[in-house]
Amino acid sequence: MAAGRASRALPRAAVAVVALALSGAGAVAETLHVAIKDLGFGPTAITARVGDVIEWTNTDFIAHTATAENGDFDVEIEPGATARVIVSKAGVVRYYCVFHPDMKASVTVLAK
């Protein structure tokens, strides 16, 4: 009798896995890379989804920040360092470097 239960449970489990995959609920967060070089962000515009990670790598010889105008994030990135932020809400976020205000970029965050 236990073998009969196991054989019935397998198709149910397979259906649950397929349903989860089709729903997108198991989607893996993406990491979007932004380089800081020559007093600039590159690329200057990216698109992410809620839950994705933005990763800045500072290859300049001086410190920079990635500071959101709306307050969503504010990270300081030392020379040779990397900083990461998980985006948590949809919308367009413009950000800049506090030390070098002409350094500007944006991220468009889409809902999951």
Residue ranges and their predicted role:
Residues A2-P11, V17-V18, L22-K112:
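Extracytoplasmic copper-binding redox domains, predominantly the cupredoxin/blue-copper superfamily
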